Structure formats: structure tokens, C-alpha cells
A protein has these predicted regions:
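Functional-site microenvironments in short loops/helix caps that host divalent-cation chemistry
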Residues: 6-7, 13, 17, 54, ...
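Short capping motifs at secondary-structure boundaries
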Residues: 32, 46-56, 117-118
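Low-complexity, Gly/Pro
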Residues: 1-2, 43, 114, 216, ...
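Short, solvent-exposed alpha-helical surface patches in non-cytosolic proteins
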Residues: 36-48, 106-112, 128
Length: 254
């Protein structure tokens, strides 16, 4: 069973005045339900078992992983990295981590899961409305308390591994505190794919994700907030990239 949080229909304020691609504005949103947690390895495993699906990283052998100690922003291609071994085979696989968010999957892989499950990815606006949880601003919490809510990189840089919160990469979903409407990990843990395009998109292969990840820190990335929007290739498979699902809200009976 997937636990859902209902977001009522209405007009919501999104964006920020300083963002060209996500300016401050009001958007009309239909009622929808959003998964309380990010999609897990266990749920993705069920999908693969039922369908025999093969992910982009498995086909192309170009999963992207981060190696602490290299350059600050350096991600490397690892032929052994895919959703079974999201950080490469040498670091072990998902055994014992079935309640962690699935990673090293592409936007296309996430869409394939959604088609099988009869759900969809949140739109850019839906994601932000849910992430804000009724708050108005870049963060739904006091920025000084972010590490109570988000699995993010705690070190000053990426030159040394950081386990100050007990997690070098992903954490089990629901480990940290939820946002005001009960969603877990909307900041940190993994970036979450969203449907929709931005005005600045110049290529058909561009897709978007939000919320930041375990890799993000104050000095790099810093996307663990409600307003920033990341861009990724439709086939790219990173070890800090996952997704959350939504469905249209059920109409009340009577």
C-alpha cells in the first residue's frame, strides 16, 4: 500500500522573485494526491519483477556516481552502476536497503514505473505546492533546522566523506521529519523528477527534478528548498536521482 497525502484544489503562490524560470506567481491546481514517501527500491523491484523492465543505465552502462575526494563537482561514469548497484558494484547493492529511495534511474524509467502503477509524476507546480505545505517562502521550516528535515551533505565540501547524520548517501524514506502536510524527504535524500517544461529549455532531451539530494550542501547545489528547479537529461541516471508519484484526487461519493 502506498500512503497518500491529499492536496486540495485551489490557487497557490509559487516561485520566487529572483528566479527567471520560476518567478513568483499564482497557479491554479486541481486536487491531487501525492505519495507520502519517495518511491523505494522495494517498489521499483516489484515493477521490474512484474514487467521485466530494463533501465536506461542497465542498457547503456553509463550510470553516474559521485566519488568523495575528487573535485568538488565531479561525477564519474561507472559501467556497473544501475538501480541494483546505484553507487557502483564495488560499494555493494540495494540488499538491506529496500526501504531506501530507488536511484540511478532515468526520467524515462520513472515514467515507465508510473505507467505500470497507474500513476504519474507531479508537475513542477504540483511538486512545489506540496513541498511548501501551506507555507510561503523558499523553505517550509527555519533554515537553521534543515538537517532535522533533510538528508543533505553536512561537510564544508565534497573532498571528504560525510556521515555526520549517519548517512553517506541515501537514507531510508521517512527517516527525517516531515513537512507541514506530512510529506517526507521533499528536501534532500534524492532529487525528484517532475513533469513539465521551462521557458529556458532549448532541447527536447531536457527534463527537471526538484528538492535537492544527499549530495547537496550549502556550498554546492543548494537545491534543498521549495523553489529551485534542476535540469537533467531524459536518459541520465544519477545516484542521487529518484522520484515521487501523484494521482488525481478521488471525487467524493454522494
Amino acid at each position: 500500500m502506498i500512503p497518500w497525502i491529499t492536496v486540495p484544489a485551489g490557487s497557490y503562490q509559487v516561485g520566487a522573485t529572483e528566479l527567471i524560470d520560476n518567478p513568483r506567481r499564482n497557479v491554479a491546481v486541481r486536487a491531487f494526491e501525492i505519495s507520502k514517501y519517495e518511491v523505494t527500491n522495494q517498489q521499483f523491484y516489484a515493477f521490474v519483477q512484474a514487467t521485466g523492465y530494463v533501465t536506461d543505465a542497465e542498457r547503456s552502462r553509463n550510470g553516474r556516481v559521485f566519488e568523495p575526494g575528487l573535485k568538488e563537482f565531479r561525477w564519474i561514469s561507472d559501467k556497473t552502476a544501475n538501480w541494483h548497484f546505484p553507487n557502483g558494484r564495488s560499494r555493494g547493492g540495494i540488499q538491506g536497503k529496500m526501504n531506501h529511495p530507488v536511484t540511478c534511474i532515468s526520467f524515462r524509467d520513472a515514467e515507465a514505473f508510473c505507467r505500470w502503477a497507474g500513476v504519474r509524476l507531479p508537475t513542477l507546480d504540483e511538486w512545489e505546492v506540496a513541498a511548501r505545505g501551506g507555507t510561503d517562502g523558499r523553505y517550509f521550516c527555519d533554515p537553521s533546522e534543515l538537517r532535522q528535515y533533510a538528508n543533505i551533505w553536512g561537510g564544508r565540501d565534497h573532498l571528504k566523506p560525510d556521515k555526520s547524520d549517519a548517512f553517506l548517501t541515501t537514507a531510508p524514506v521517512g527517516t527525517f521529519r516531515p513537512n507541514p502536510i506530512g510529506l517526507y524527504d521533499v528536501y534532500g535524500n534524492v532529487f525528484e523528477f517532475c513533469s513539465g517544461r521551462m521557458r529556458s529549455d532549448t532541447r527536447d532531451t531536457q527534463r527537471h527534478s526538484r528538492g535537492g539530494s544527499w549530495w547537496c550542501s550549502k556550498n554546492s547545489c543548494c537545491f534543498f528548498n521549495s523553489v529551485d528547479i534542476g535540469t537533467v537529461n531524459v536518459r541520465a541516471s544519477f545516484s542521487n536521482q529518484g522520484f515521487r508519484i501523484v494521482r488525481d484526487a478521488k471525487k467524493p461519493v454522494g
